[in-house]
């Protein structure tokens, strides 16, 4: 594990960019960027286009301002290159950004008010590959739809079970038990989640990171942020607009952003580089300001 990267993730001001759209969400991401589905004929072409979009973002001067401390990548982006360098190496060596890899394979159908991650027996193999690419950590998402005690306990147990396997490969996991912002009893679900997270953290011997939905009650996750086994807590934008997400985030001290959609809002394939860079820089500045409050 890279100690300098560990320090950066523990305390550097800034936020984590999420560029980890996978097969299912790529068409939506491309459409928002102004590339219609008829612009590509195959999955291969679709992934090439999204790689071009991500390359444009990562090589933009806006990405070199030191305000983004980490970035979450999709597998194919990790295996790809930027300006002739493997993506993770380019991020760290040219941008001083810590690379993470999305490792889950999507969600199971809802049961007990939650969606667990699909089983993934190849997790260890993917972790080894990530280590070979000089990736620092991972991220995996599951979703809480209802304030169901059993369901939430299952979600947290699965996240920590995967997390321990990831740690055994020398990677730092970002656990992401997202609470759906439309959950009818969101505050109650968050109470159960916090209790279960603290119970698991108390049993850990190595620190992890956590990615959460911005809580209903401001500063609700304070004990988790201060827990010795918690490296950093980041927040997802969860369907809020960037403005709304930034506003909510700025009220939660010690939590930094890990936005995907909110980061690419307003970017378009048709923009000139100057327009694209200016828009990206403004987005990064907004999210950064909300993260350091």
From Swiss-Prot:
This is Fructose-bisphosphate aldolase class 1. CDD domains: FBP_aldolase_I_bact. NCBIfam families: PRK05377.1. Pathway: Carbohydrate degradation; glycolysis; D-glyceraldehyde 3-phosphate and glycerone phosphate from D-glucose: step 4/4. It comes from the Bacteria. The active site is at 176 (proton acceptor), 211 (schiff-base intermediate with dihydroxyacetone-p). The lineage of its organism: Bacteria, Pseudomonadati, Bacteroidota, Bacteroidia, Bacteroidales. Keywords: Glycolysis, Lyase, Schiff base. Its EC number is 4.1.2.13. Belongs to the class I fructose-bisphosphate aldolase family. Pfam families: Glycolytic (PF00274). GO terms for biological process: glycolytic process. Signal peptide: none annotated. GO terms for molecular function: fructose-bisphosphate aldolase activity. It comes from Porphyromonas gingivalis (strain ATCC BAA-308 / W83). The keyword Ion transport does not apply.
């Amino acid at each position: 594990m890279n100690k300098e990267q560990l320090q950066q993730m523990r305390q550097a001001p800034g936020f984590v960019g999420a560029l980890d759209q996978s097969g299912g969400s790529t068409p939506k991401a491309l459409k928002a960027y102004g590339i219609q589905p008829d612009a590509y004929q195959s999955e291969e072409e679709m992934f090439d286009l999204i790689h071009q979009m991500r390359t444009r973002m990562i090589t933009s001067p806006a990405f070199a301002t030191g305000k983004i401390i980490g970035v979450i990548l999709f597998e194919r982006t990790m295996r790809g290159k930027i300006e002739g360098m493997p993506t993770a190496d380019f991020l760290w060596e040219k941008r001083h950004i810590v690379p993470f890899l999305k490792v889950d394979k999507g969600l199971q159908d809802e049961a007990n008010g939650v969606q667990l991650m699909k089983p993934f027996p190849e997790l260890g193999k993917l972790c080894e590959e990530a280590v070979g690419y000089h990736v620092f950590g991972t991220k995996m998402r599951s979703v809480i739809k209802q304030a169901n005690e059993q369901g939430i306990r299952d979600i947290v147990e699965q996240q920590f079970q995967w997390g321990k396997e990831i740690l055994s490969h020398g990677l730092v996991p970002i656990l992401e038990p997202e609470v759906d912002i439309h959950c009818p009893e969101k505050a109650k679900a968050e109470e159960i989640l916090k209790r279960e997270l603290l119970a698991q953290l108390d049993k850990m011997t190595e620190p992890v990171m956590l990615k959460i939905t911005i809580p209903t009650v401001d500063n609700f996750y304070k004990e988790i942020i201060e827990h010795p086994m918690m490296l950093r807590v980041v927040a997802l934008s969860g369907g809020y607009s960037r403005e709304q997400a930034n506003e909510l985030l700025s009220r939660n001290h010690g939590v930094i952003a890990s936005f995907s959609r909110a980061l690419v809002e307003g970017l378009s394939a048709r923009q000139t580089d100057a327009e694209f860079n200016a828009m990206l820089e403004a987005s990064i500045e907004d999210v950064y300001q909300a993260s350091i409050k």
